[in-house]
Amino acid sequence: MASRDSSAASEITPDVLLRAYACGIFPMAESVDDPSLFWVEPDMRGIIPLGGFRVSSRLARTVRSDAFTVTVNRDFKAVIDGCAAPQPGRDDTWINRRIRELYIGLHDIGHCHSVEVWQDGDLAGGLYGVSLGRAFFGESMFHRARDASKVALVHLVARLLAGGYTLLDTQFVTDHLKSFGAIEVPRLRYRSLLDDSLEGEASFAALPLDRPVTGTEALAIITRT
């Protein structure tokens, strides 16, 4: 289920990408230096049930302290570049030049969003993902300071809950995501959840976009579910 020639990759547009997400598939690259893309549709799909999102007591204290400043869509390109950069335990990345271009294109038309986490004016971590209907597809996250990507995820989930989203797709499940409540569901079950989430519209702007949301505000939304 893959097409790895670079000419096929160049024909993928943001609109084609949105249609692919609506069908339950997403693109990846073998490495940052590989110009081609291939489509992925896992047999078992990772999701975080929004009503079952878990925040540890230690992380909640960090979020509540506002040691980080959290913004949305302030520097999308810096976030995707941070996700593409090597990190401890991960020397390579699947975010190649074409992937970067496509998701910047989705961001430009309002279907891809970033959450930035700042510390003393520097970008300490963040994440980005695709918004379609009432579904949010988490693409990648990174951190340069302890807990920065975790704080980004907490703020993302608060925003999704406030905006009426019903599906948070993580694509795959890692031990890290399991600690937040991530589970795997079979492809048919995932497609049912996806179809339901595409029947309505959610708002990524239900929480303010023009000012940072405090950790206390974010946690209050999560604990109400």
Swiss-Prot record:
GO function term, MF aspect, one: leucyl-tRNA--protein transferase activity
Pfam families: Leu_Phe_trans (PF03588)
Gene3D superfamilies: Leucyl/phenylalanyl-tRNA-protein transferase, C-terminal domain
Record field: catalytic activity: N-terminal L-lysyl-[protein] + L-leucyl-tRNA(Leu) = N-terminal L-leucyl-L-lysyl-[protein] + tRNA(Leu) + H(+); N-terminal L-arginyl-[protein] + L-leucyl-tRNA(Leu) = N-terminal L-leucyl-L-arginyl-[protein] + tRNA(Leu) + H(+); L-phenylalanyl-tRNA(Phe) + an N-terminal L-alpha-aminoacyl-[protein] = an N-terminal L-phenylalanyl-L-alpha-aminoacyl-[protein] + tRNA(Phe)
InterPro entries referenced in this protein's UniProt entry, alphabetically: Acyl_CoA_acyltransferase, Leu/Phe-tRNA_Trfase, Leu/Phe-tRNA_Trfase_C
GO CC, one annotated term: cytoplasm
GO biological process terms held by the UniProt record: protein catabolic process
Keywords attached to this entry: Acyltransferase, Cytoplasm, Transferase
Location relative to the cell: Cytoplasm
EC number(s) on file: 2.3.2.6
NCBIfam families, sorted: aat (TIGR00667)
Function: Functions in the N-end rule pathway of protein degradation where it conjugates Leu, Phe and, less efficiently, Met from aminoacyl-tRNAs to the N-termini of proteins containing an N-terminal arginine or lysine.
Family in the record: Belongs to the L/F-transferase family.
Database matches in HAMAP family: Leu_Phe_trans
Name under which the protein is recorded: Leucyl/phenylalanyl-tRNA--protein transferase
Organism from which the protein derives: Rhodopseudomonas palustris (strain TIE-1)
Gene that this sequence comes from: aat
